[in-house]
């Protein structure tokens, strides 16, 4: 859809570009673009890449001076996510090994998966994109997983805001991996009122509070019994209840969160008071003024007594800065005020600067008139056409309105409307209890959370039919009401019932070519990536009636978007990227529709080429 819309923009700016020097129009129209769709399983490019990697030529090069190295290539024809294959391989062949194991991955989720691996000497190598960009050279982080787990457990057991504890290292790490995945994953929508990236400290605090509340019962969120991981309903209920104040604050001050980018962090930094729209600017400015005073005193060897005894300011400062010493961020929460100031002095002597605070009064940007976007446009010397493309990609100016990219209004009087709009239900009955249909929504989301838990902790299979059928997540308040109304047996039955979604016979599931067709709009750029027999069938007059209704008409959708000043077709509320927006005319296929799709597409008579590109087997680990 995005590329089709950009074609319209190019046509609109054709005359302008023709008037520019250096054949700008021709260079734009005929620019060399490499479609990312080519790296999708089922394409000719991926088939060639697999054959190339497995060729004698490459295998010989890989083994040069590495005769003892066992190189395993698992490709797209072996189903499964790459990280899942790594985890399963380690579990099967390296379980409790005394050897050192290192995993290389750009995916942050793999850090969590590494924390669950049964290996003592485990490291993860990760390319640090942000630092590499800053220093204009490749910089890698080497993460010692055992040290990471010990540091996390030390933080939990020695948190200065709570009593000193002795919770078990493995249990703490199981729990935090679980918490991290439940509140931030690619399988179910995030809960709108809980921002994992900008408010993870609140989640950590709620977890630690729950851990201490249930200490006498020796209860953790995750338990390992007879080699299988189980999720505690009791703990889950309690940790969600401990997060409800955060949700209530988000709802009460919804306008504030929808205005300031770091509102969640600001709330945490100044947790001793209630931050609202009226005081946020003055509180922040006063804090920054005091930080400026502290920096000047350190620079000039002034009297620091005021700051050494000012717990309120220093606690806020500790929460808002990261002091890097020896390439490590020092956790200042355990330090006294005097030691923190001493560390700041040492940092200044070493770098001649002070750490920046991680909070600011930046607002969510919706216009090219905002300073950040003005600077980008000026630095890149964009012409009018490029500015239009930039506005489109970032959903700025008229696109902000056209695509309904405003913040989602979750103020108190808009909650029921939220459920009506995104779930099509009435939330509460006359007694303020969840309606039957609302309970179904909560059940679906609970099943989703359990599926995510099972995926990370237990499930070693590769093919699964489960999916979350809604576009949004319910709010914690109503999820909590639902969990209070179910018993442990029902909860455990939901977890054990997930096995029914596992695909036992891979022949009954999508092969690479079928999956490419299933997830892609049948536009010319995609169709030409298919084997010739599929191309002929899809463009013929004999296309199966089901497929005629299944394939979306991208041009029709783009026509509507182009013509309407405010689209009734697309919903981008609180969605940062255009490709994640909700297209209302596109519904998620049901499992029965999946079967109809496979029946229809398998009418295509296979050829030698399509057969090669349609192979599908399971790894042996």
UniProtKB/Swiss-Prot annotation:
Catalytic activity, EC: 3.1.11.-
Keyword Nucleotide-binding: no
Keywords, alphabetical: Exonuclease, Hydrolase, Nuclease, Virion
GO molecular function, a single term: RNA binding
InterPro entries on file: 5_3_exoribonuclease, Xrn1_helical, Xrn1_N
Broad enzyme group: hydrolase
Major location (coarse): virion
Statement: the UniProt record of this protein carries the keyword rRNA-binding: no
Disulfide bonds: none
Family statement drawn from the similarity comment of this UniProt entry: Belongs to the 5'-3' exonuclease family.
Protein name (record): Putative 5'-3' exonuclease R528
């Amino acid at each position: 859809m995005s590329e089709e819309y950009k074609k319209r923009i190019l046509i609109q700016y054709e005359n302008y570009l023709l008037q520019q020097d250096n054949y700008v129009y021709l260079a734009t129209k005929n620019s060399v673009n490499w479609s990312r769709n080519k790296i999708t399983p089922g394409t000719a490019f991926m088939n060639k890449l697999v054959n190339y990697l497995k060729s004698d030529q490459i295998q010989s090069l890989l083994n040069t001076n590495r005769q003892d190295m066992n190189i395993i290539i698992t490709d797209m024809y072996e189903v499964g996510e790459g990280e899942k294959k790594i985890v399963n391989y380690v579990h099967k062949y390296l379980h409790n090994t005394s050897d050192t194991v290192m995993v290389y991955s750009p995916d942050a989720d793999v850090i969590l998966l590494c924390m669950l691996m049964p290996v003592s000497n485990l490291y993860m190598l990760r390319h640090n994109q942000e630092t590499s960009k800053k220093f204009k050279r490749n910089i890698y982080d080497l993460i010692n997983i055992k040290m990471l787990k010990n540091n996390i457990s030390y933080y939990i057991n020695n948190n200065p805001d709570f009593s000193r504890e002795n919770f078990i290292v493995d249990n703490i790490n199981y729990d935090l991996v679980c918490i991290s995945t439940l509140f931030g994953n690619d399988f179910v929508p995030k809960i709108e009122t809980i921002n994992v990236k900008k408010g993870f400290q609140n989640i950590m605090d709620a977890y630690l509070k729950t851990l201490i509340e249930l200490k006498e019962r020796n209860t953790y969120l995750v338990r390992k019994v007879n080699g299988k991981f189980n999720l505690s309903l009791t703990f889950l209920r309690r940790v969600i209840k401990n997060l409800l104040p955060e949700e209530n604050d988000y709802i009460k001050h919804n306008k504030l969160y929808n205005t300031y980018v770091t509102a969640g962090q600001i709330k945490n930094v100044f947790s001793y008071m209630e931050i609202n729209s009226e005081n946020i600017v003055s509180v922040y400015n006063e804090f920054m003024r005091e930080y400026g005073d502290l920096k000047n005193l350190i620079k000039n060897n002034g009297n620091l007594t005021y700051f050494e005894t000012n717990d309120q300011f220093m606690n806020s400062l500790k929460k808002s800065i990261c002091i890097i010493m020896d390439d490590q961020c020092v956790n200042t929460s355990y330090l006294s005020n005097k030691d923190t100031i001493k560390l700041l002095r040492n940092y200044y002597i070493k770098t001649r600067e002070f750490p920046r605070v991680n909070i600011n009064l930046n607002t969510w940007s919706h216009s090219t008139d905002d300073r950040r976007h003005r600077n980008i446009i000026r630095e890149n010397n964009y012409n009018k056409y490029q500015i239009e493309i930039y506005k489109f990609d970032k959903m700025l100016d008229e696109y902000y309105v056209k695509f309904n990219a405003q913040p989602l209004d979750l103020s108190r009087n808009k909650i029921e409307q939220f459920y009506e709009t995104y779930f099509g239900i009435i939330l509460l009955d006359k007694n303020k209890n969840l309606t039957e249909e609302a309970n179904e929504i909560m059940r679906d989301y609970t099943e989703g959370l359990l599926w995510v838990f099972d995926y990370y902790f237990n499930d070693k299979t590769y093919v699964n039919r489960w999916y979350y059928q809604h576009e949004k997540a319910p709010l914690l308040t109503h999820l909590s009401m639902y969990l209070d109304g179910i018993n442990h047996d029902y909860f455990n039955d939901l977890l054990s019932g997930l096995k029914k979604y596992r695909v036992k016979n891979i022949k009954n599931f999508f092969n690479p070519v079928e999956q490419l067709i299933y997830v892609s709009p049948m536009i010319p750029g995609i169709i030409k990536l298919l084997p010739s027999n599929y191309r002929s069938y899809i463009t013929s007059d004999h296309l199966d009636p089901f497929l005629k209704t299944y394939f979306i008409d991208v041009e029709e959708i783009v026509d509507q978007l182009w013509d309407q000043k405010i689209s009734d077709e697309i919903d981008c509320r609180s969605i940062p990227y255009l490709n994640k927006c909700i297209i209302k005319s596109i519904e998620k296929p049901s499992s029965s529709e999946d079967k109809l799709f496979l029946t229809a597409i398998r009418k295509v008579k296979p050829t030698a080429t399509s057969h090669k590109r349609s192979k599908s087997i399971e790894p042996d680990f």
